């Protein structure tokens, strides 16, 4: 990613929240596929409207906020765009939602995990955001915005063959696979590799085994210890036939040889497949700016 955009810098500092889980059985994400998709489309339109800005037409931004935002998100956006609106230079900021998946959907409330790309004067930036939106008078309005989110997962449904149970089993499997794939320790490179190999299958496993020596040496030379951040985020982009594609986000905690810890936001897609009582990854696609 090239130079970070002011909007993304402000979002990161101003809009991180914890969130809450919904009761078991209350999460209809992908269970009611049609309404889930419609809610995601509405949140996408709202997010792109209120996270874009043209200094030549500031009234359009105010109108977008009035139409698409409620609750805490109003103050978050005011704080977010304060610096942008005061810029002495012309600003033409365009935001688009690259990917989005529902974390939870209850009919009148949706929380989704979205990858945003912002472009301004040839510069682009990427951020992963959790949006909460409420259905108000037939219209979906953003009520909370969290960039680089760390929020607890909704209460899982039983893995009983239902769509909700399959979804939550796949998400738990994806989080477990991510923990093995993206957690490394330069003082134990062989163990780090072994943990990763144990959670992959298919051509990805073949690739790991073919490059084992390279992976182990790279981990050893890194001189770091990498762990997932608290409350990693996972949402299903697609689900069916014992397979799922999952959008995953965490702020990796990277500890260097001197003990200094740096947070590194990390977003990826994971393809996972059921393998007996567990789930294994068949593909890993880190999300980067276009």
Per-segment meaning from a language model:
Residues 2-45, 111, 127, 146-183, ...:
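Juxtamembrane and targeting peptides
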Residues 40, 50, 69, 102, ...:
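A compositionally biased, intrinsically disordered/low-complexity signal enriched
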Residues 124-158, 245, 265-290:
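Short beta-strand edge/turn micro-motifs at domain boundaries
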Residues 86-123, 220-258:
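Surface-exposed, charged secondary-structure patches
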Residues 31-86, 162-221:
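Core segments of small alpha/beta cavity-forming domains
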Residues 70-78, 82, 96-105, 110-111, ...:
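Intrinsically disordered, glycine/charged-rich N-terminal periplasmic/extracytoplasmic linker segments
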Residues 81, 116-118, 146-149, 212, ...:
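A mature extracytoplasmic/lumenal domain signature
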